[in-house]
Amino acid sequence: FELLPSQDRSCCIQKTLECLENYPGQASQRAHYCQQDATTNCPDTYYFGCCPGYATCMSINAGNNVRSAFDKCINRLCFDPGH
């Protein structure tokens, strides 16, 4: 079992954030869509997609302010073995 698949975390987070910024006020609803979108745009994003832990954090915290949620979520584990 590979606990933390190797992938380009910075690509996943950047692409997810860029996508979310296209949906002002809808970030919470769009986080998982944007995570899937990032998966198609980042190489080697593994079987589970592009940093799902970050996308989940953004969906919970984003509300109307993507940037403040970004600050909370930037260090979130991509793959949490507890879930």
From Swiss-Prot:
Gene Ontology CC entries for this record: extracellular region
Domain of life where this protein originates: Eukaryota
Main location: secreted
GO molecular function: toxin activity
Modified positions (Histidine amide) in chain numbering: H83
Keywords from the UniProt entry: Amidation, Disulfide bond, Hydroxylation, Secreted, Toxin
Post-translational modification: Contains 5 disulfide bonds.
Subcellular localization: Secreted
UniProt KW Secreted keyword: yes
Modified residues (4-hydroxyproline): P24, P43
Distribution of this protein across tissues and organs: Expressed by the venom duct.
Subunit structure: May form a non-covalent dimer.
Domain notes: The cysteine framework is XXI (CC-C-C-C-CC-C-C-C).
Protein name from the UniProt record: Conotoxin p21a
Organism: Conus purpurascens
Origin organism lineage: Eukaryota, Metazoa, Spiralia, Lophotrochozoa, Mollusca
